[in-house]
């Protein structure tokens, strides 16, 4: 009986620490698109998942690189861009990447379901549910961050630079650029790879080519609403397009759908040939850019406004200096980084 009492008491303290939403020397709470907290004593990040079966954007990237153009693992390099969602299975949450290549654009739920079942999805990661608070599930997010998502090991091996593996004892969460905003959350981790350097490229750039470290970045980003109107791709336009197979297409139509990638602009007054827009495209210039480069960037980027005005959108493309109180990692700001 006494054993059960103490066990219950210990578990209670564990749960309180995991789900704590206060900031102190042992806990740092982040509130945003996803809430999460960092526990210093455990050296872990616990994510609060309140969005089950809701799509969002997941992007991984490298904050720091290796410094070799030939290897191609560079500072700021984007990795994969994926539409993902959390799904609950028993006492697990799985981070699932639905198959966007094969779809059924239809109001017929059975038709949509048939196509979804015909093609494989990808489970990116699995998490044990540590605690449930109403409709919020708490998971240990740390192992997800401390993995080789960017594929550094595979890249080095393919270029015959050596066989490396991730050394977790020399890896750690990086809190400096781990942040939360209303529409996105950002995470970083320093990853150290150990192995026997075999290639000239890796040997020429790292202080110790048998131990190389990079900082890997992860972004979870809220998707916009469904009011965007897609536009068919015309090969004469020179536009960039995205494509997928639509199995709900009428038999006389092409099953391969192509839509251009474009900005979302809406006129305030659609009856006018020239009208201001509801929400302009605004790019913010890094205030750290020196002169005369800053002015050149401002003038060059602002030139695009002429192109938009030529097709009837007034003041649709704007360039401003990033405000002092704005964070360039907040996805509400499009930043031209110096």
Regions found by a protein language model. Name each.
Residues 1-22:
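Bacterial Sec-dependent N-terminal signal peptides
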Residues 54, 288-316:
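Zn2+-dependent metallopeptidase catalytic core
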Residues 22-289, 298, 321-338:
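Auxiliary tRNA-acceptor-end handling modules of aminoacyl-tRNA synthetases
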């Amino acid at each position: 009986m006494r054993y059960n009492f103490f066990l219950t008491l210990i578990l209670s303290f564990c749960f309180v620490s995991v789900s704590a939403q206060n900031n102190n020397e042992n806990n740092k709470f982040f509130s945003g698109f996803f809430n999460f907290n960092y526990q210093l004593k455990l050296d872990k990040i616990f994510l609060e998942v309140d969005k089950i079966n809701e799509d969002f954007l997941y992007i991984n990237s490298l904050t720091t690189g290796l410094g070799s153009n030939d290897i191609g693992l560079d500072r700021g390099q984007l990795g994969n861009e994926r539409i993902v969602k959390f799904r609950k299975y028993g006492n697990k949450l799985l981070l699932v990447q639905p198959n966007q290549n094969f779809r059924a654009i239809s109001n017929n739920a059975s038709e949509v379901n048939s196509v979804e079942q015909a093609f494989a999805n990808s489970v990116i990661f699995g998490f044990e549910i540590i605690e449930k608070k109403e409709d919020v599930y708490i998971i240990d997010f740390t192992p997800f961050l401390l993995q080789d998502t960017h594929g550094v090991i595979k890249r080095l091996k393919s270029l015959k630079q050596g066989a490396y593996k991730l050394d977790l004892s020399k890896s750690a969460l990086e809190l400096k650029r781990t942040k939360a905003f209303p529409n996105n959350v950002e995470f970083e981790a320093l990853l150290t790879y150990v192995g026997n350097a075999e290639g000239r490229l890796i040997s020429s750039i790292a202080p110790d080519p048998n131990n190389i470290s990079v900082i890997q970045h992860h972004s979870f980003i809220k998707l916009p609403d469904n009011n965007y109107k897609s536009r068919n791709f015309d090969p004469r336009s020179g536009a960039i397009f995205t494509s997928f197979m639509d199995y709900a297409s009428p038999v006389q139509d092409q099953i391969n759908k192509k839509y251009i990638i474009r900005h979302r602009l809406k006129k305030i007054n659609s009856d006018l040939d020239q009208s201001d827009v509801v929400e302009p495209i605004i790019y913010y210039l890094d205030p750290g850019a020196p002169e005369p480069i800053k002015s050149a960037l401002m003038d060059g980027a602002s030139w695009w406004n002429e192109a938009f005005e030529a097709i009837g959108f007034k003041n649709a493309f704007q360039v401003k200096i990033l405000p002092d109180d704005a964070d360039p990692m907040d996805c509400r700001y499009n930043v031209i980084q110096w």
